[in-house]
UniProtKB/Swiss-Prot annotation:
Some earlier publications concluded that the product of the reaction of GtfA with sucrose was a glucan, because of its insolubility in ethanol. Keywords: Cytoplasm, Dental caries, Glycosyltransferase, Transferase. The active site is at 193 (nucleophile), 234 (proton donor). It holds the Pfam family Alpha-amylase. Sucrose binds at residues 49, 87, 191-193, 234, 291-292, 335-338, 392. SUPFAM superfamilies: (Trans)glycosidases. GO terms for cellular component: cytoplasm. Signal peptide: none annotated. This is Sucrose phosphorylase. It comes from Streptococcus mutans serotype c (strain ATCC 700610 / UA159). It comes from the Bacteria. Intracellular catabolism of sucrose. Being intracellular, probably not involved in synthesis of extracellular polysaccharides.
Length: 481
């Protein structure tokens, strides 16, 4: 199914019901026309990071179901799957074969060798400091071979996630076979997880290394195109990187919108939001929440450093059951630039403020992605957080089918479902159309979307001082109650 301009639900295979069958039933029964696509977070056998340390992309974790269940989902919704282009599990057959056979392994070039990467007498501390890291030490891991020798491999993320060498032909063959298999099983859009880390080059920070990163991106796009799929690079960094990618006619993420929207709702000032909406490309997926924390680094220079600090402080002040320690190493937080909270709790579990945040997202340029906890206006799950000591689990509640049936009766959830059903069905949100943004006063923003020929005009007038709104289409008032 081609990508369509309808809201994409982000979910794990076992977060809305116990498995893929229940997920399929629950989306159909409770979300209806509010959902047009599904980002199915990693459902492959994995040894860590909630699926992001995959063992084998050709299998579905049996706890979730099988490929028939995945294909069944794809009959009703366009689908996005994750491809961890930077790494694979050290429990994979590729790693084990390399460990057993060393230089005789067919996969010896699949992994990026840390020792061979550096010239003699390097890396120096200066070299290590230059690397854009996700940990406070050199991103390497020891590998002990069956022949008794010891070497080191690049290891950017968790201990289970061993980096691939994307410059080698064996790796490109692996990428090709993986993408072909994903597309054959219903994948329409391939999310390239942690894409900016994939290329490493001497005397750089090893993050979004140009021009090599463009060569890799184009190669992967060409591979996907053969199977009729498209790609979405996932990169958390300065917004100008997203704009560069958009200029090359790729889909991009809007990871800045979450913090810009929080700042606007906390401060009752719309100037930063208005400027951002005017700048944003149409060929993008918008987010307020994902399976990770709320990104801070993405909003630099859209908000000033003072405004970022203000927003972070307000989140901890007005947020419900939010604590700074939940985003620290004590709770296994890899990324100091993310805040762990559901978006609903970041707004103090306030129904009206939360609905306005989603209204802004619905009218923003691009296609909305809504995380499953966000669709159900979910609160911070402190029980799961404390039982696992995993900070991101505060926003990873497991909903039973019975819980979902109860949650969708809440007025705020009903309103959200009506909002995104409207967004999916209205012609005004044409990605080839236009957006106009006005700010009648400091606290009021008027966002107007119209289709290419101007026959459908939707307008949202939002006042962040008194937290009111009015939505019209072709001058007819639209209600979401």
């Amino acid at each position: 199914m081609p990508i369509i301009n309808k809201t994409m639900l982000i979910t794990y295979a076992d977060s809305l019901g116990k498995n893929l069958k229940e997920l399929n039933e629950n989306i159909e029964n409770y979300f209806g026309d509010a959902v047009g696509g599904v980002h199915l977070l990693p459902f492959f056998p994995s040894t860590g990071d909630r699926g992001f340390a995959p063992i084998d992309y050709h299998e579905v974790d049996s706890a979730f179901g099988d490929w028939d269940d995945v294909k069944c989902l794809g009959e009703k919704y366009y689908l996005m799957f994750d491809f961890m282009i930077n790494h694979i599990s050290r429990q994979s057959k590729y790693y084990k074969d390399y460990q057993e056979k060393h230089e005789a392994s067919a996969y010896k070039d699949l992994f990026l060798n840390w020792d061979k990467f550096w010239p003699k007498n390097r890396p120096t501390q200066e070299d290590v400091d230059l690397i854009y890291k996700r940990k406070d030490r050199a991103p390497k891991q020891e590998i002990q071979f069956a022949d008794g020798s010891v070497e080191h491999l690049w290891n950017t993320f968790g201990e289970e996630q061993i980096d691939l060498d994307v410059t080698k032909e064996v790796t490109m063959d692996f990428i090709r076979s993986t993408i072909e298999n994903l597309a054959a099983n219903g994948c329409d859009l391939i999310r390239l997880d942690a894409f900016a880390y994939a290329v490493k080059k001497l005397d750089t920070n090893d993050f979004f290394v140009e021009p090599e990163i463009w060569t890799l991106l184009d190669k992967v796009r060409d591979i996907a195109a053969v199977s009729g799929a498209e790609i979405l690079p996932e990169i958390h960094e300065h917004y100008t990187i997203q704009f560069k990618i958009a200029d090359h006619d790729y889909y991009v993420y809007d990871f800045a919108l979450p913090m810009v929207t929080l700042y606007s709702l906390y401060s009752s000032k719309v100037d930063r939001l208005a400027k951002w909406l005017k700048m944003s490309p149409m060929k993008q997926f918008t987010t307020l929440d994902t399976h990770d924390g709320i990104g801070v680094v993405d909003v630099k220079d859209i908000l000033t450093d003072e405004e970022i600090t203000y927003t972070s402080n307000e989140l901890y002040k007005v947020g419900a059951n939010v604590n700074r320690k939940y985003s620290t190493a004590e709770y296994n937080n890899l990324d100091i630039y993310q805040i762990n909270s559901t978006y609903y709790s970041a707004l103090g579990d306030d129904d009206q403020k939360y609905f306005l945040a989603r209204l802004i997202q619905a009218f923003a340029p691009g296609i909305p992605q809504v995380y499953y906890v966000g669709f159900l206006a979910g609160k911070n799950d402190l029980e799961l957080l404390e039982s696992t000591k995993e900070g991101r689990n505060i926003n990873r509640h497991y909903y039973s089918s019975e819980e979902i049936a109860k949650e969708v009766k809440r007025p705020v959830v009903k309103a959200l479902l009506n909002l995104f059903t409207y967004r999916n069905q209205s012609a005004a949100f044409d990605l080839d159309g236009r957006i106009e943004v006005e700010t009648p006063n400091e606290a009021t923003i008027v966002i107007e979307r119209q289709n290419k020929d101007g026959s459908h005009i939707a307008k949202a007038e939002i006042n962040l001082q008194d937290m009111t709104y009015r939505v019209t289409e072709n001058d007819q008032t639209i209600s979401f109650e």
